[in-house]
Amino acid sequence: MKPIVSILIFCALAVVIMGHPLDSGYGIPHIVEKLPNGQWCKTPGDDCSKNNECCKPKDPENYSSGCASQWSGMQGKRVNMCRICYIESSMC
């Protein structure tokens, strides 16, 4: 019983420290604006093909945005998704 509890605590701490792998930064304040092509920028978590399609963070000094490749369990392959993350984070 003790090893099982230790493993569960370790897993919980790992998730808290490293974050969820599908966390795209949707909760981080971002600017939703129209792009030169007339479309709206894509919010974090949306599919993308280029960095300039993604919405920019309201605080660009501390946060970075872009189009990054992530594993999609739903599609069973890697897909490009818009992300916003804290610059000082090792996951950015």
UniProtKB/Swiss-Prot annotation:
Alphabetical keyword list: Disulfide bond, Glycoprotein, Ion channel impairing toxin, Knottin, Neurotoxin, Secreted, Signal, Toxin
A GO-annotated cellular component: extracellular region
InterPro entries associated with the record: Cys_Knot_tox
Major location category of this protein: secreted
Family: Belongs to the neurotoxin 21 family.
Main function: Probable neurotoxin with ion channel impairing activity.
Listed name of the protein: Toxin ICK-19
Natural source organism: Trittame loki (Brush-footed trapdoor spider)
